Amino acid sequence: GQRVANLATKMYLSDYPDAHEVSRIVAIIQTGSYLHDTIDEKICEDPSKVISEIEELLPKIGFTELEAQDILFTIQHMSFSANIEHHYQLPLSGQYVQDADRIESLGAIGIARAFTYGGKHGNKIYDPKIKPEKLISHDQYRNHVETTINHFYEKLFDLEGLMNTPAAKKEAHRRTEYMREFVQEFMDEWNV
């Protein structure tokens, strides 16, 4: 949504200071940012129907066929789960959308989101008997038993190393350090 679009645009303009904020690539980045969650399997019952609707919409709002292909490829191949078994190389615009979406999972907002998601799905906050797993398949990622603290070790701490762009690498590092401090404090308090 809005934060992903703002962050993706800000990072692109940081990496390309001579670019204009009202350029074609910025329009592609922002459109991809707004559309990226519309086909998320966690919230969308029929992704193929939504993809068809987006395919019809993009030319009507002024995108060329190539630009529309970039947007569609990005939103279909940018998710963490889509890249567990195979890494997809996204167009430059898509790299900024993917990085911004992943950065949303980091830092203070990422911590809040992790605990909100865990609570909503009935996950334990922490259980020392449940060890973090190395996630190697989409099915394992979607179906394994996890705790919220394990989610930091199984996914969130790894996102920093998956960033594509210079500005994202810098921001991801800053937010990951904050999360590491939080998890260390949590473990110190847990083990009193």
What are these regions (language model features)?
Residues 1-29, 41-42, 57-61, 82:
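Alpha-helical phosphate/pyrophosphate-handling elements in metalloenzyme active cores
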Residues 2, 6-21, 35, 86-192:
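Divalent metal-dependent phosphate-bond-processing catalytic cores, especially two-metal-ion Mg2+/Mn2+ enzymes
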Residues 22-44, 50, 72-81:
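His-Asp-centered metal-binding catalytic motifs of divalent-metal-dependent phosphohydrolases/nucleases
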Residues 25-30, 67-71, 107, 152:
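Residue-level detector of well-ordered alpha-helical segments, enriched
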Residues 48-94, 103:
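Helix-adjacent hinge/juxtasegments
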